[in-house]
Amino acid sequence: MTTIALDAMGGDHGPKVVVPAALDSLEQNPSLRLVLVGDESVLREYLKDTRRRFGDRLRVHHASEVVEMHDQPSKALRNKKDSSMRVAIDLVKQGDADACVSAGNTGALMAIAKFVLKTLPGIDRPAIIAAVPSMTGHTHVLDLGANVDCTAEHLYQFAVMGYELVRAVEEREHPTVGLLNIGEEEIKGNEQVKRAAELLSGAHVNFVGFVEGDDIFKGSVDIVVTDGFVGNVALKSSEGLAKMISHFIKREFSSSLLTRLAGLIALPVLNAFKHRIDPRQYNGASLLGLRGIVIKSHGNADRFSFANAVTIAVKEVEKAVPHRIGERMTDVFAARNLA
């Protein structure tokens, strides 16, 4: 039985989304146990009679405070020690939960998770990784915003972590790793990227060299590594592009009676296209490099999206991702010391 602690008060919608998503997750996975962390009186009102259906597979753990989306990470860490976010992560630290899922403030989540859980040996900084849609299925990208400025060593560590995550959760023996750059040629890029490429060439990962921004969506590689500034810009740009495309398609097909009829004929194709680029099915970013599993849901996630983040958490628990990353880092650094 896998136990996941949910920050029930975090995000733009709080328990209005988290509670229904939790119930959906329990329905779909009979081997799942969930802990809703937050204001007990509020949560019980949302649950009412539904909690009885799941017995001890669903329980409420009271937390008196909430980390707001505008809270500064340092203040949330220092001043809100009984927040739903902090308590959910504490449950992971104490062994009462196998993972935590939160739609709350990203900066606060990273700060609290790093403080409470600590990083794995050999990891300087945790990184945020998520899957984005591509022509071949999806591509994992990291870092997506945790680290704005990165050294070559950080990029190297990100690549090793991402490689091991994809090997574990997707059961690919040798996923390909690309380093995001302004061109594929070795002479291009800043010094950090060039040095990171040198490190990765001997890192015992399937490093294929530099890739460009369009390779993320072409699916040229399984994992794209970059710093958090570029990664976050790329992610937000892709989300905006998907919305723009959907907007224009909807507008063009509703511009006249003829285009409306054409839209009805094309509806199955349009629905398939919409599903393919729907960001909700990719919701759930992992905070890699910690001694525990923490999944960040989009702050504006709906119930389907949040349930997907729970599914990602379950998979990482089943595959023991932190343990595997820890073992990989130990092997990598042992090999580097011998070289």
Swiss-Prot record:
Keywords on record: Cytoplasm, Lipid biosynthesis, Lipid metabolism, Phospholipid biosynthesis, Phospholipid metabolism, Transferase
Any Pfam family the entry gives: FA_synthesis
GO cellular component terms, A-Z: cytoplasm
SUPFAM superfamilies assigned: Isocitrate/Isopropylmalate dehydrogenase-like
Xref: InterPro entries: FA_synthesis, Phospholipid_synth_PlsX-like
EC class of the enzyme, as a word: transferase
Gene Ontology biological process terms from the UniProt entry: fatty acid biosynthetic process; phospholipid biosynthetic process
Domain of life according to the entry: Bacteria
An annotated Gene Ontology molecular function: phosphate:acyl-[acyl carrier protein] acyltransferase activity
Subcellular location: Cytoplasm
Signal peptide from the UniProt entry: none
EC code(s) of this entry: 2.3.1.274
Keyword GTP-binding applies: no
Quaternary structure note: Homodimer. Probably interacts with PlsY.
NCBIfam families: plsX (TIGR00182)
Family from the record: Belongs to the PlsX family.
UniProt function note: Catalyzes the reversible formation of acyl-phosphate (acyl-PO(4)) from acyl-[acyl-carrier-protein] (acyl-ACP). This enzyme utilizes acyl-ACP as fatty acyl donor, but not acyl-CoA.
Record-linked PANTHER family: FATTY ACID/PHOSPHOLIPID SYNTHESIS PROTEIN PLSX, PHOSPHATE ACYLTRANSFERASE
The name this protein goes by in its record: Phosphate acyltransferase
Provenance organism: Methylococcus capsulatus (strain ATCC 33009 / NCIMB 11132 / Bath)
Gene for this chain: plsX
